[in-house]
């Protein structure tokens, strides 16, 4: 029985934007979100805090690291400071916290041990939070429709809630054609324990969040926490205190304004290169680079490598109809990863022709003067031509007969 390969560290079909951008989008569609300003330097963060201090003397502040990763609150910094969301009492404290965040790495459950570099923070006025909830809208493929998931256990990881208290989760299936009904949202608000005017306020805000989900081709809108806060005028209102929104990359052609928000400087350079070449790539922590056509075959390849004692350095799906140039770029990406010590190419040619793959491999190996062990398994359309191209190339390529053979040879190549 195969052992499962390590869990991937990111999605390959989504665009993710920062919290401050997500909140602006929510406000655009009529939702209430905690406002704040972004600072790229500690000095700017102090200036923002001073401006708030002048408007609301004696107010407190929240400094939030702007990184494309969840779990900030429970994360820690490379230099030891705890938390990517910190409370400050004065503008000078805001400066000191921002100085510990900007230019440093934040490590969370989602970033792995390497962490992620922070180059900006969001400075907000602190608010009095009376209650916290979790709410998300996402696609449920099993149900074939969008689903609202909510719980009164806000501020926690939803996975933790689902494990410890599954009965605390509320799921509301939504009609794709009509969207959420008032009856559905009123019931949800009451299930969350809201009363009086807060029920309708919750309904209005969830409707706004669904507009973001629907109109912007979102794959996920996650608010954690969604809070009941007390305003300076002692009014109790619903407010999005944090926001994470992801978008379907296939919608880029009609969501140009949103996709212009993409922060490539915060992404793995390999991810950016793969995206530009229309390749599906996710970096992992192993040392065997993989290039495969088809997500299912890619997962099977990673599992088989793991079964034979190896560890995949990536998930890389070149798709079912890759051109020679894409094959070449895929190999360049693998070769650029300093952790990769061996490469396994596993291609099953249906629409894709094995001779095209072989030509791309040969061109890339010669161009890069690749000196890593390279194991190639080809099967399918024009496989004989493909194998002949590789055999006659004179290159040091290790042929494999099947997936198991390829995985064993890739793992063995690390020992030579």
UniProtKB/Swiss-Prot annotation:
Cofactor binding note from Swiss-Prot or TrEMBL: Binds 1 Mg(2+) ion per subunit.
Signal sequence, start to end: none
InterPro entries: ATP-grasp_succ-CoA_synth-type, ATP_grasp_subdomain_1, Succ-CoA_synthase_bsu_CS, SUCC_ACL_C, Succ_CoA_ligase-like_bsu, Succinyl-CoA_synth-like
Catalytic activity: succinate + ATP + CoA = succinyl-CoA + ADP + phosphate
Organelle targeting sequence: 1-14
Positions of the record's site feature: Important for substrate specificity: 60, 128
Amino-acid positions noted as binding Mg(2+) in the UniProt annotation, renumbered to this chain: 224, 242
Record-linked PROSITE patterns: SUCCINYL_COA_LIG_3
Binding residues for ATP: 64, 71-73, 132
EC number of the protein: 6.2.1.5
Co-factor(s): Mg(2+)
Keyword terms, alphabetized: ATP-binding, Hydrogenosome, Ligase, Magnesium, Metal-binding, Nucleotide-binding, Transit peptide, Tricarboxylic acid cycle
Entries under Pfam families matching the protein: ATP-grasp_2, Ligase_CoA
GO CC annotation: hydrogenosome; mitochondrion; succinate-CoA ligase complex
GO molecular function: ATP binding; magnesium ion binding; succinate-CoA ligase (ADP-forming) activity
Binding residues annotated for substrate, in chain numbering: 293, 350-352
BP term (GO), one: tricarboxylic acid cycle
Family: Belongs to the succinate/malate CoA ligase beta subunit family.
Quaternary structure annotation from Swiss-Prot or TrEMBL: Heterodimer of an alpha and a beta subunit.
Annotated function: Succinyl-CoA synthetase functions in the citric acid cycle (TCA), coupling the hydrolysis of succinyl-CoA to the synthesis of ATP and thus represents the only step of substrate-level phosphorylation in the TCA. The beta subunit provides nucleotide specificity of the enzyme and binds the substrate succinate, while the binding sites for coenzyme A and phosphate are found in the alpha subunit.
Name of protein: Succinate--CoA ligase [ADP-forming] subunit beta
Gene name in the database record: SCSb
């Amino acid at each position: 029985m195969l052992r499962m390969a390590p869990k991937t560290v990111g999605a390959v079909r989504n665009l993710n934007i920062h919290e401050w951008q997500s909140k602006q989008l929510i406000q655009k569609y009529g939702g209430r979100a905690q406002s704040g300003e972004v600072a790229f330097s500690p000095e700017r963060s102090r200036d923002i805090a001073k401006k708030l201090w002048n408007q609301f003397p004696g107010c407190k502040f929240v400094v939030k690291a702007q990184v494309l990763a969840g779990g900030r609150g429970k994360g820690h910094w490379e230099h030891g400071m705890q938390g990517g969301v910190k409370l400050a009492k004065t503008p000078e404290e805001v400066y000191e916290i921002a100085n510990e965040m900007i230019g440093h790495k934040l490590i969370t459950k989602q970033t792995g041990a390497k962490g992620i570099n922070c180059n900006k923070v969001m400075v907000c006025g602190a608010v009095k939070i009376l209650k916290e909830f979790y709410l998300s809208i996402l696609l449920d493929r099993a149900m074939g429709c969008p689903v609202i998931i909510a719980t009164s256990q806000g501020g926690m990881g939803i996975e933790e809630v689902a494990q410890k208290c599954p009965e605390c989760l509320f799921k509301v299936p939504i009609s794709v054609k009509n969207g959420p009904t008032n009856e559905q949202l009123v019931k949800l608000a009451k299930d969350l324990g809201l009363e009086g005017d807060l029920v309708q306020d919750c309904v209005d805000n969830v409707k706004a969040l669904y507009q973001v989900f629907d109109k912007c081709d979102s794959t996920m809108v996650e608010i954690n926490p969604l809070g009941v806060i007390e305003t300076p005028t002692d009014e109790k209102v619903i407010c999005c205190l944090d926001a994470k929104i992801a978008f379907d990359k296939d919608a880029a052609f009609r969501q140009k304004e949103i996709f212009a928000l993409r922060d490539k400087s915060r992404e793995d350079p390999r991810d950016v290169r793969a995206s530009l070449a229309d390749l599906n790539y996710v970096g992992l922590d192993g040392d065997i680079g993989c290039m495969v056509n088809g997500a299912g075959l890619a997962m099977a390849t990673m599992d088989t490598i793991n079964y034979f004692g190896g560890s995949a350095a990536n998930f890389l799906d070149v798709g079912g109809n890759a051109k020679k140039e894409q094959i070449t770029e895929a190999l360049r990406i693998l070769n650029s990863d300093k952790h990769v010590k061996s490469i396994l190419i596993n291609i099953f040619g249906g629409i894709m022709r094995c001779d095209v793959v072989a030509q791309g491999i040969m061109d890339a190996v010669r161009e890069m003067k690749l000196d890593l062990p390279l194991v190639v398994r080809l099967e399918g359309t024009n496989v004989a031509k493909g194998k002949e191209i590789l055999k006659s190339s004179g290159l040091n390529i290790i042929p494999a007969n099947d997936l198991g053979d390829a995985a064993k040879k890739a793992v063995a190549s690390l020992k030579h």
